[in-house]
Amino acid sequence: MSAIKDHYKQMLDEYHIVWEERQHTEELILNADEVVKSPGIPGDAPMMLKIQEKGIPVISEIEFAGRYTDAKMVCITGSNGKTTTTSLIYHIFKSAGYNVGLAGNIGQSLAYQVATCDYDYYIIELSSFQLDNMYEFRANIAILLNITPDHLDRYNYNMQEYVDAKFRILQNQTDDDAFIFWNDDPIIQRELSKHGIHAKLYPFAEDKREGVMAYTDSDELYFTAPYAFNMEQEELALTGKHNLYNSMAAGISASLSGIGKEVIREALSTFRGVEHRLEYVARVRGVDYINDSKATNVNSCWYALQSMTQKTILIIGGKDKGNDYTEIADLVREKCVGLIYMGLHNEKLHEFFDPFGLPVADVQSMKDAVDAAYRMAKSGEAVLLSPCCASFDLFKSYEDRGEQFKACVRAL
């Protein structure tokens, strides 16, 4: 249990909300009518088990706040791309002059904004952990970007439990609502018939086919409904194949919300990327340093490696969540000229990647990782921090990990 930051204490005091830190007063919690749980707390934590034993309802902050607003909810989930797509949609809505808030895993809490603002729309990034404790909340537009193995340590290493959590974004939707999804995702395709979907379907795909609302053809990105338009891929602010899909999802959601095609096209071309996601840091002695600290699972790293055009030193490692590195094996062989294992327990990385015959280094701090990469990289190559893992073995968060990386690079 950690301390509360000073500015949050000040805010709690301002609103006369009782708080405590570094402890839980069991008597108070177990006498509650309802518990709002932070998504980072696992369901098998000792206090949570006591709450369950007493039969006290447990909800997420999103579920709680959603009771007190009639605003339209545009909700985004998926294993990868959530933050980028959420930020991109928010950028489009703001560009259109909409009265809109940004919440969920990004921005201020939904509860704080509902209490202090009067927005017409909220763009909400939802993790599987948040969805687990949502029951009556309704997304007017639900977006499911993709599903790949992630957080399996929180789901009994059972992929179906994780998949079911992601599909909770559809609960309570009606035929007035919209479900936007990646049509090429095999898991999503397999699951569609299982979940009794009531919303209208708006799939997007890599190629043109019947029924898709956005697709690519040659170097163009096409939107078919409700406002048909196209734009050249090179006009998009975000690069990489994965960002084509993120842009499709964002464009469809904006179109469905009444935003015109010219505004959407302009916003897709002016968006500035998300910090810690394929973020260019600096070029040092001819070597480019890229911060992809937000890549906390293998699939995120796959997208990052796929986008690399230079030979790459990959910094990988952290708190393993049941990772299967097979997904990136071919890309590591093709793109990488060295590996830096950064973590307290790197045995699994050694076992999987050492047979590739690449130069490797073991480190337990960001400074050592950057120094090792600096020694290993040659002019014209790149150093990519894309860890595949959670950050909590050596860092406070993925943001802390990314900030340390940038600071160490700039100190070279």
Language-model region placement:
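NAD(P)-binding Rossmann-fold cofactor-contacting core
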Residues: 1-9
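C-terminal helical cap/extension that packs against the catalytic core
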Residues: 9-13, 326-381
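Glycine-rich, highly charged phosphate/nucleotide-binding loops
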Residues: 13-28
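Beta-strand->loop->alpha-helix junctions that form or flank phosphate-binding loops
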Residues: 20-23, 59-63, 196-216, 267-269, ...
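Phosphate-binding loop of NTP-binding sites
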Residues: 26-32, 39-183, 187-199, 393, ...
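Short active-site oxyanion
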Residues: 32-34, 98-100, 174-179, 286-289, ...
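Nucleotide phosphate-binding/pyrophosphate-handling subdomain across enzymes
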Residues: 231-336
